[in-house]
């Protein structure tokens, strides 16, 4: 069986390696686009926005509601009207987390972008650590690893095993040595992120963006972050079916896409 070549990127991606080696970015020049995919997070969305606003960087806050049904949409609109959200986009049907991120990314203008989940599992106080290698000119993308020693809530053993297996499988195909491919926290240069032509709708976003960054031969750093995972009773959405699907996504985006 012959697979399509992995070395046939789009014109936009093909141009990215030539952008490496830039001079450092002055912190005063930073505009951080914060991409917040939201689905039925009425209990936490105000709290996460408080944490986002507390980080002293110039930022563009973009929320995409993926057809919430618990009152989140109305709450988001009130916060937009109050000036707490810069851009608010509503999906007219539930399309998935990846689709919400892609919608937010298309609306972004910042020279660095980061995805921020709305569920309080990831702490915006870790942003400075994620941004430092990009501002120093050492990295094009920085992954925040939950397994490099940062404080974390102790929860599910099998989730950790599953994450290790998926990260290892992804590393085998990308030839990277990441410890946490599935992390939400990926700070990426804005020009890079917007050129990647992402297609995933659900939780395939993480394997896809990792594969595309690797294929473009960009500089990836990994730094430790804190993590406060939720239980399913508290609203955690990802399950074992998403883990199984991730295997297919890793194969697809490294061998076929």
Language-model features: where?
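Short beta-strand/loop segment that forms part of the nucleotide-sugar
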Residues: 49, 53, 58-68, 89-91
């Amino acid at each position: 069986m012959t697979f399509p070549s992995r070395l046939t990127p789009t014109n936009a991606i093909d141009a990215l390696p030539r952008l490496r080696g830039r001079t450092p970015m002055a912190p005063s020049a930073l505009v951080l686009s914060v991409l917040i995919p939201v689905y039925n997070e009425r209990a936490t969305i105000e709290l996460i926005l408080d944490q986002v606003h507390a980080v002293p960087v110039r930022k563009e806050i973009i929320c995409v509601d993926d057809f919430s049904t618990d009152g989140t949409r109305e709450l988001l609109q009130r916060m937009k009207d109050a000036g707490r959200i810069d851009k608010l986009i509503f999906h007219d049907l539930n399309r998935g987390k990846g689709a919400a991120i892609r919608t937010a990314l298309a609306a972004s203008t910042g020279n660095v972008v980061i995805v921020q989940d709305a569920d309080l599992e990831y702490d915006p106080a870790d942003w400075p650590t994620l941004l430092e290698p990009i501002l120093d000119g050492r990295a094009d993308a920085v992954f925040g690893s939950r397994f490099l020693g940062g404080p974390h809530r102790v929860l599910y053993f099998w989730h950790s095993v599953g994450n290790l297996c998926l990260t290892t499988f992804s590393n085998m195909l990308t030839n990277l040595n990441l410890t946490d491919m599935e992390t939400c926290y990926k700070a990426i240069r804005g020009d890079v992120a917007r050129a990647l032509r992402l297609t995933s709708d659900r939780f395939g976003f993480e394997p896809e963006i990792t594969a595309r960054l690797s294929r473009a031969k960009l500089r990836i750093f990994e730094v430790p972050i804190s993590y406060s995972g939720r239980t399913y009773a508290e609203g955690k959405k990802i399950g074992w079916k998403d883990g199984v699907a991730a295997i297919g996504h890793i194969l697809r985006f490294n061998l076929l896409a």
